[in-house]
Amino acid sequence: MSHIQRETSCSRPRLNSNMDADLYGYKWARDNVGQSGATIDRLYGKPDAPELFLKHGKGSVANDVTDEMVRLNWMTEFMPLPTIKHFIRTPDDAWLLTTAIPGKTAFQVLEEYPDSGENIVDALAVFLRRLHSIPVCNCPFNSDRVFRLVQAQSRMNNGLVDASDFDDERNGWPVEQVWKEMHKLLPFSPDSVVTHGDFSLDNLIFDEGKLIGCIDVGRVGIADRYQDLAILWNCLGEFSPSLQKRLFQKYGIDNPDMNKLQFTLMLDEFF
């Protein structure tokens, strides 16, 4: 993502709601990095006021924003997360206003301080182990392989999968080929934990060298631990294969299951 402008200035929307009072006096910037389908605006520059984020989803994306609100409420007991300021839901739209976690994303830190890569990966591994240690019996959300495959097939059948955004390994593949090759990797035994669902470098926040929280938790749920490991491993590949190897070492896996890893990355292409 380093080759694109991560934010562009934008104007404040008119919501005509009790949320409006919290929006006045801020400067606005539109996020260009997220791929959730929602619009994400950063609110900043208001004297003596914290930075905020406003996420808006329409249609099916409104359900995704609602899912994130519900998971934020549940996850706050276990992990450092943004705080919900307001949530509005109508039949077609959802708006979620949260506090910002101060700092920079792991991606930004790795770009600015490439020599800190090993320390960053070590912190990510510790944080991920903490997340995966949440008792599965406490989690009310299912994000397992079967659930995600049903969602993926629906998106494929409705033409919602963007083949132009596939990883380099699958560049030029039709969606149906990814679906076919993915199923060749089945079956395998699940190793279920509470997962983030999109444990990417852009969703992990560092401040003063410490990993202090995560964002974008709309896919939190019980799934195989490789749901998180594979996505983070893939992100680290933009920087160095040595960081990818270190991730598994520090997480505590001596022999990564490449079958699970590749399955997860193929499945993620559908979202």
UniProtKB/Swiss-Prot annotation:
One of its GO terms (molecular function) is kanamycin kinase activity. The active site is at residue 198. SUPFAM superfamilies: Protein kinase-like (PK-like) (SSF56112). Pfam families: APH. Its EC number is 2.7.1.95. Gene3D superfamilies: 3.90.1200.10, Phosphorylase Kinase, domain 1 (3.30.200.20). Keywords: Antibiotic resistance, ATP-binding, Kinase, Nucleotide-binding, Plasmid, Transferase, Transposable element. InterPro entries: AGP_Transferase, Aminoglycoside_PTrfase, Kan/Strep_kinase, Kinase-like_dom_sf. It comes from the Bacteria. It is an enzyme of class 2 (transferase). One of its GO terms (biological process) is response to antibiotic. It catalyses: kanamycin A + ATP = kanamycin 3'-phosphate + ADP + H(+). Belongs to the aminoglycoside phosphotransferase family. Resistance to kanamycin and structurally-related aminoglycosides, including amikacin. This is Aminoglycoside 3'-phosphotransferase. The lineage of its organism: Bacteria, Pseudomonadati, Pseudomonadota, Gammaproteobacteria, Enterobacterales.
